[in-house]
């Protein structure tokens, strides 16, 4: 039995997944009005005031640490929600797996807390 027919649906979905962005960008380029190459239109303009000085500002690393911790726990929520919706069907094994997952995340949170990543001062 050839292996190729087994993956027909995969290749079809892969082709569709590649064609949708290409078609969306092509249609957007065809339908969108032409833009002028005026350099004034590419300048920074906010709240009716022309910017003064350099626009590059260095952010403190604390912002990135908070963002990283937020992303970690946001991803945790994304993984836990489908599990919670099908909790009755999955059984005790899935509960043990999720418990290990949450324990690993709690250990990571304690590590970040002890390293001072969550302190603002």
UniProtKB/Swiss-Prot annotation:
Catalytic activity as recorded in UniProt: a plastoquinone + NADH + (n+1) H(+)(in) = a plastoquinol + NAD(+) + n H(+)(out); a plastoquinone + NADPH + (n+1) H(+)(in) = a plastoquinol + NADP(+) + n H(+)(out)
Cross-referenced HAMAP family: NDH1_NuoA
Its job: NDH shuttles electrons from NAD(P)H:plastoquinone, via FMN and iron-sulfur (Fe-S) centers, to quinones in the photosynthetic chain and possibly in a chloroplast respiratory chain. The immediate electron acceptor for the enzyme in this species is believed to be plastoquinone. Couples the redox reaction to proton translocation, and thus conserves the redox energy in a proton gradient.
Cross-referenced Gene3D superfamilies: NADH:ubiquinone/plastoquinone oxidoreductase, chain 3
Source organism per UniProt: Staurastrum punctulatum (Green alga)
A matching Pfam family: Oxidored_q4
Entry's transmembrane regions: 10-30, 65-85, 90-110
Enzyme Commission number(s): 7.1.1.-
Membrane topology category: Multi-pass membrane protein
Protein name (database record): NAD(P)H-quinone oxidoreductase subunit 3, chloroplastic
Principal EC category: translocase
UniProt GO BP: photosynthesis, light reaction
Single GO cellular component term: NADH dehydrogenase complex
One function term, GO molecular function aspect: quinone binding
Subcellular location: Plastid, Chloroplast thylakoid membrane
Entry annotated with the keyword Transport: yes
InterPro entries per the UniProt record, alphabetical: NAD(P)H_OxRDtase_bac/plastid (IPR023043), NADH_UbQ/plastoQ_OxRdtase_su3 (IPR000440), NDAH_ubi_oxred_su3_sf (IPR038430)
Sorted UniProt keywords: Chloroplast, Membrane, NAD, NADP, Plastid, Plastoquinone, Quinone, Thylakoid, Translocase, Transmembrane, Transmembrane helix, Transport
Family as reported in the entry's similarity comment: Belongs to the complex I subunit 3 family.
Subunit structure: NDH is composed of at least 16 different subunits, 5 of which are encoded in the nucleus.
Keyword flag Iron: no
């Amino acid at each position: 039995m050839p292996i190729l027919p087994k993956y027909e649906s995969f290749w079809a979905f892969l082709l569709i997944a590649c064609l949708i962005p290409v078609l969306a960008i092509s249609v957007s380029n065809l339908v969108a009005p032409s833009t002028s190459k005026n350099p004034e239109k590419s300048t920074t303009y906010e709240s009716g005031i022309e910017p003064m000085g350099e626009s590059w500002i260095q952010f403190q690393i604390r912002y990135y640490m908070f963002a990283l911790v937020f992303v970690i726990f946001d991803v945790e929520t994304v993984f836990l929600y489908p599990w919670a919706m099908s909790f009755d069907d999955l059984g005790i094994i899935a509960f043990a797996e999720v418990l290990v997952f949450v324990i690993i995340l709690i250990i990571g949170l304690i590590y970040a807390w002890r390293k001072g990543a969550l302190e603002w001062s």
